[in-house]
């Protein structure tokens, strides 16, 4: 039996260590190879994407046109805007079911073939009506309108959140609500709170924004407004100051009034016409319900007419509590303030709270006293009464 010398033992130990080092190095290199292969695949995908993007950018622009008539599976009559009509081929990848008269399409420059279906064009004004940022008003910020809020939520919010309740009962949910009452009583505020609470598209428009100079422009805006609402359903449309376009129609009218009447008739057709409206709810607000056209007020268009009156004593007290909850009050009797502000609107009460705070700031105080509120009541309501007296006397003098 041979015995290894000391040098041989040392060499064998170095050899084993070297083998271990090589194995570890091989594993490291294999890991690097896998990482490089993954990077290569990623870069190849990026290269393919960039080549595809370059190919799309190199494509010549297409003409925009409108389908006039679909002849068969492969051909259609199209019209370039304000230009001649062409009988063209339809690309095989186009969904024939979506091609209808009036559909906007992209046409190839050389062959005029239909190569793409374009979305419906909309006036930028209509797109601007959509409310992107939700108002920060909640139901808790509204005082004295519990009954009105309940009726509004039942008609608009409940069908959007729990449509199954109406299906079980076997009734159709209300389609529209009209809020009417004196100025400053919270009609727009209720709509803002509803927009904050519901998970639906909210479109706000003032009635006067739908009035246009040229014939048919206002009616077109109304049509595009409801088309946008249908596309983004569930949707709530809030029309503020609807009396601007919803006044009673007269026999003798000027050119401008006839255009307003055309806009109103388009609104009537959109709200309850031949085509179904879908999951689109309409809320309108006005200070003048007496001048609205009767066709606008019938069920099917506005199923609920909600009066938003001047607040009573309890309502005024609730409104004062809402507007003073962040104020530092010292010795203030809100019940007494509510009693002496009979006939005041919610806007008046907010102005009173603001003026009371201004009186405190004027005297370099961080708290508000009863005396501040008394002076604020006299300033806000006293000025209003004087202004009304001046207007009345002016009408008496000048007719």
Curated annotation (Swiss-Prot):
Where does the protein end up?
Cytoplasm
SMART domains to which the protein is assigned, alphabetical = AAA (SM00382)
Q: What are the annotated GO cellular component locations?
A: cytoplasm; proteasome-activating nucleotidase complex
| Sequence positions that bind ATP | 184-189, 323
**Pfam families the record matches:** AAA, AAA_lid_3, Prot_ATP_ID_OB_C
Q: Which GO terms describe its biological process?
A: proteasomal protein catabolic process; protein unfolding
GO MF: ATP binding; ATP hydrolysis activity
| Signal peptide (residue range) | none
Annotated segments matching region Docks into pockets in the proteasome alpha-ring to cause gate opening: 397-399
**Residue stretches in coiled coil:** 19-60
Q: Which UniProt keywords apply?
A: ATP-binding, Chaperone, Coiled coil, Cytoplasm, Nucleotide-binding, Proteasome
Which family would the database say this protein is a member of? Belongs to the AAA ATPase family.
NCBIfam families (alphabetical): PRK03992.1 (NF003069), proteasome-activating nucleotidase (TIGR01242)
Functional summary from the UniProt entry: ATPase which is responsible for recognizing, binding, unfolding and translocation of substrate proteins into the archaeal 20S proteasome core particle. Is essential for opening the gate of the 20S proteasome via an interaction with its C-terminus, thereby allowing substrate entry and access to the site of proteolysis. Thus, the C-termini of the proteasomal ATPase function like a 'key in a lock' to induce gate opening and therefore regulate proteolysis.
> Which proteins does it associate with, and in what oligomeric form?
Homohexamer. The hexameric complex has a two-ring architecture resembling a top hat that caps the 20S proteasome core at one or both ends. Upon ATP-binding, the C-terminus of PAN interacts with the alpha-rings of the proteasome core by binding to the intersubunit pockets.
Q: What is this protein called?
A: Proteasome-activating nucleotidase
């Amino acid at each position: 039996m041979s015995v290894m010398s000391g040098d041989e033992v040392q060499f064998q130990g170095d050899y084993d260590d070297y083998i271990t080092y090589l194995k570890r190095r091989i594993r490291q290199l294999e890991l690097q190879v896998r990482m490089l292969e993954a990077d290569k695949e990623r870069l190849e995908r990026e290269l393919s994407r960039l080549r595809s993007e370059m190919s799309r950018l190199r494509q010549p622009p297409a003409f925009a046109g409108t389908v006039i008539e679909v002849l068969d599976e492969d051909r259609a009559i199209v019209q370039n805007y304000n230009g001649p009509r062409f009988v063209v081929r339809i690309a095989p990848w186009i969904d024939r079911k979506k091609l209808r008269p009036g559909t906007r399409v992209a046409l190839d420059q050389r062959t005029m073939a239909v190569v793409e279906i374009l979305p419906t064009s909309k006036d930028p004004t209509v797109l601007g009506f959509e409310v992107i940022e939700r108002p920060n008003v909640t139901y808790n910020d509204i005082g004295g309108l519990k009954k009105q809020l309940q009726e509004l939520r039942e008609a608009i919010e409940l069908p959007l959140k729990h449509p199954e309740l109406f299906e079980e009962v076997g009734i159709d949910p209300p389609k529209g609500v009209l809020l009417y009452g004196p100025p400053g009583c919270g009609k727009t505020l209720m709509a803002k709170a509803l927009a904050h609470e519901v998970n639906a598209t909210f479109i706000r428009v003032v009635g006067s924004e739908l009035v246009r100079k040229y014939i048919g422009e206002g009616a077109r805006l109304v049509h595009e407004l409801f088309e946008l609402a249908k596309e983004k359903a569930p949707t709530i449309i809030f029309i503020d100051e609807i009396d601007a376009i919803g006044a009673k129609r007269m026999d003798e009218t000027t050119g401008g009034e006839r255009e307003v009447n055309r806009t109103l008739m388009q609104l009537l057709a959109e709200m309850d016409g031949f085509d179904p409206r879908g999951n689109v709810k309409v809320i309108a607000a006005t200070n003048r319900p007496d001048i609205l056209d009767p066709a606008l007020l019938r069920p099917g268009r506005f199923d609920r007419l909600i009066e938003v009156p001047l607040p009573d004593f309890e309502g005024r007290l609730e409104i004062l509590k809402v507007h003073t909850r962040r104020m530092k009050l010292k010795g203030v009797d809100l019940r007494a303030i509510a009693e002496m502000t009979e006939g005041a609107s919610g806007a008046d009460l907010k102005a009173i709270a603001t003026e009371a705070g201004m009186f405190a700031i004027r005297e370099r105080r961080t708290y508000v006293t009863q005396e501040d509120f008394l002076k604020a009541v006299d300033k806000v309501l006293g000025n209003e009464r004087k202004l009304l007296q001046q207007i009345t006397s002016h009408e008496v003098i000048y007719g």
